[in-house]
Design a protein with these regions (language model features):
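Generic structural signal for beta-strand residues in well-ordered domains
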Residues: 1-3, 25, 113, 125
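N-terminal Rossmann-like FAD-binding beta1-loop-alpha1 element of flavoenzymes
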Residues: 3-33
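Short, solvent-exposed loop/turn segments at secondary-structure junctions
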Residues: 15-16, 39-41, 121
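Short glycine-/acidic-enriched loop or helix-start segments at secondary-structure transitions
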Residues: 20, 44, 125
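A structural signal for short, well-ordered beta-strand segments and their strand-loop junctions
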Residues: 33-36, 115-117
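Glycine-rich active-site loop/strand segments that organize a redox cofactor
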Residues: 37-99
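Feature captures the FAD/FMN-dependent oxidoreductase FAD-binding
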Residues: 74-139
Length: 139
């Protein structure tokens, strides 16, 4: 069975682990990986009701509170998608859950450390380390 060593591993690709993965991009000497059993990114797909708003400020995106100059900020997402000026002109205090899900997906697509179709079968702690077992490898 193939073995891979990382300094940090995360199980799941939700907002918390996406935030950690995005912030770790600047840490060149840290080997890390995040594993999600889903085939691609999705966030609360069953809760994307029309008009549903995020209950927190868009300023609390994945990176801005820690690194406001990060290329993974919500503002960078708006610029990339050519929606910055319409967003600013609308003076939106809150954003839709659907737009935030699009932002999360945009970030997820840019993070090579996030692996999909990676179902963790077992987690063990041995010899001072955690070991994650998959069907085809151990991390």
């Amino acid at each position: 069975m193939n073995q891979q060593h990382v300094n940090l591993a995360g199980i799941g690709a939700g907002p918390f682990n996406l935030s950690v993965a995005a912030l770790l991009q600047k840490c060149r000497n840290t080997r890390y990986a995040f594993f999600d059993k889903k085939p691609e990114f999705s966030w609360h797909s069953g809760l994307m009701l029309p008009g549903a708003k995020l209950q927190t400020s868009w300023m609390k995106d994945l990176v801005t509170p820690v690194d406001p100059t990060s290329p993974y900020s919500f503002l960078k997402f708006l610029v990339e998608k050519r929606r910055f000026y319409s967003f600013i002109n609308a003076e939106q205090a809150s954003i839709s859950r659907q737009e935030f899900a699009q932002y999360l997906g945009w970030v997820a697509q840019q993070l090579p450390a996030v692996q999909y179709n990676a179902h963790v079968r077992e987690v063990n702690y041995q010899q001072g380390r955690f070991w994650l077992r998959f069907d085809d490898r151990i991390v």
